Amino acid sequence: TDRQVRGLLLDVLRDGDGTATAARLDAVWPDALQRGRALASLVDDGLMVRVGDRYSLPG
């Protein structure tokens, strides 16, 4: 589900230094469309920030 993918993507940021490249997040889930929806919704919801090819936790 999209919710599952959102959780996996956030886990990558939480388990690291709070930032990850788009390529690193691409490795989390094989379905590019579903992963893209999840990333977009996380950014729209303010739970993730995108700067260039990197994503990070807000703040």
Predicted regions and their residues:
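HhH-family (HhH-GPD) DNA N-glycosylase catalytic core used in base-excision repair
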Residues: 1-59
